[in-house]
Amino acid sequence: MAAAPPSADPLDKALIVDVDQWIEQLYECKPLSENQVKTLCEKAKEILEKEPNVQEVRCPVTVCGDVHGQFHDLMELFKMGGKSPDTNYLFMGDYVDRGYYSVETVSLLVCLKIRYKDRVTLLRGNHESRQITQVYGFYDECLRKYGNSNVWKYFTDLFDCFPLTALVDGQIFCLHGGLSPSIDTLDHIRALDRIQEVPHEGPMCDLLWSDPDDRGGWGISPRGAGYTFGQDISETFNHSNGLTLISRAHQLVMEGYNWSHDRNVVTVFSAPNYCYRCGNQAAMVELDDDLKYSFLQFDPAPRRGEPHVTRRTPDYFL
């Protein structure tokens, strides 16, 4: 007798039961065991490595920016935006570092991805990298919570598989950072080999590191990676690719969202009171069936018994 064809969905019934239990546990901010994280990352890799560099997303969708390990504020985001999978979510990267709950935050988002893969899109941010996480907190948090670096390794290996960008209904282009002088078209992005550590330079690096700027043309980025790009660049890119908007994250904005380049670009930031001290609001963008947008702003969740903030790491863009 011929063997049954492999299921298109890598989740079997037993794993669905496990993942549902993990999600329930993580909603209580209780980390998974090291072995559970290993299984989680193996299953997520099967899904994420098949996704293209420009992931097609249908509206309605709610688009979110950086969350940076601020787990209780992610709960606030879900309270405002709706629970998964009722709401279709697109996150534009930077799940880890800076906040105190990177492990729980990224574990939950990856669980939701494998459980509801067509209702959750996870893009790669510049912090989804081995080098950056060793400086800004995720590596140290993994050592503290697990006693070794295995969980950090499982996740940073998985980060190599995250798609770089998304395209909502062919019109709204979503990514973490910004544009690149090496990239004129979405087809250029589709042709990149993304399954690797974030390079120090080049088009993949630029997509995760660049920022819009008031000055025209391309400029040297003060971050030491990526570029700054002016309104002329955004307008040309949008026109050439039939886009109405570039939605990106990567920069703290005090209202949670900020228009630039004559509404060719919007920045969305979803970590309120960033680093537990910046005093900013957070936001997400709801795109309805007709791609009409509304911004949902939210404040930080009440904090109970969180560790005292110490400033140990350099602030490369505060």
Curated annotation (Swiss-Prot):
N-terminal signal peptide: none
Q: Which cofactor does it need?
A: Mn(2+)
Q: Where in the cell is it found?
A: Perikaryon; Cell projection, Axon; Cytoplasm, Cytoskeleton, Microtubule organizing center, Centrosome; Cytoplasm
Report TM segments: none
One GO CC term on file: axon
The keyword Hydrolase belongs to this UniProt entry's keyword annotation: yes
Q: What is this protein called?
A: Serine/threonine-protein phosphatase 2A catalytic subunit
Q: What is its main location?
A: other
Species source reads Caenorhabditis elegans
Task: Give the molecular function GO annotations.
Answer: DEAD/H-box RNA helicase binding; metal ion binding; protein serine/threonine phosphatase activity
Locate the residues binding Mn(2+) 2: 94, 126, 176, 250
Broad EC category: hydrolase
